[in-house]
Structure formats: structure tokens, C-alpha cells
Amino acid sequence: MNVIHSAWQNGCKKLEFLGSSCIYPRMAPQPMKESCLLTSELEKTNEAYALAKISGLKYCEFLNRQYGTDYISVMPTNLYGPNDNYHPTHSHVVPALIRRFHEAKVNG
């Protein structure tokens, strides 16, 4: 929120806010749609983080509406990189797929 507010105070016309897929309800139907936002209970284990991300997303929307800024929110889900978790049962989607592709190639 501080970065968004500072950007607005300093005349920044464009901003990209990074959200998270955790802003959607715990039991959102799949495939998930943007319209699911705020329709039911969030996952309790990351609710505070999700609420902070929802606040940022909404703040960008309000500034756009009221002041004509071009602040967008994107949800960069399924990213991977250095130090990612490639555990066979406890990893995210992309690292799990990379591991499985590698194992399939190695094992024929």
C-alpha cells in the first residue's frame, strides 16, 4: 500500500501491482475466474497475506477510477526460479513438472 500511495503522490501515471492467486476463495471453482474474488472464505493459513494483496488490488482500482491513473494488477502464478522447491510431493506446479520431465528423460 505504501508503494502504491507513494507512486500516486509523486505523479506516477502507470504502475504494475503484483498480486497472488491466494486472493481467491479457498474453494473457488476451477478453472478459477476473476469474478470469484471476494465470493467466499479465504484460505486461513495465508488470509492476512491475501487481504493485503486484495487491498492493494482494490486501491489500484480506486485510484484509476478517481484519478485516471493506469495502475494494473497482475497475478504471476506458477513462477519458478533459483532455490525453488522441486520435491516430488511438496512443490508447486512448474517445478513439479520440470522434475517429472527430467526424470522421464533420464529414466527413458
Where are these regions (language model features)?
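Conserved active-site region of classical short-chain dehydrogenase/reductase
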Residues: 1-5, 58, 95
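Conserved Rossmann-fold NAD(P)-dependent oxidoreductase catalytic core, especially the SDR/UDP-sugar
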Residues: 1-46, 72
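NAD(P)-dependent short-chain dehydrogenase/reductase
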Residues: 27-36, 61-108
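Active-site loop-to-helix junction immediately N-terminal to the catalytic Tyr of the SDR YXXXK motif
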Residues: 42-48, 62, 88
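Active-site YXXXK catalytic motif of short-chain dehydrogenase/reductase
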Residues: 49, 53
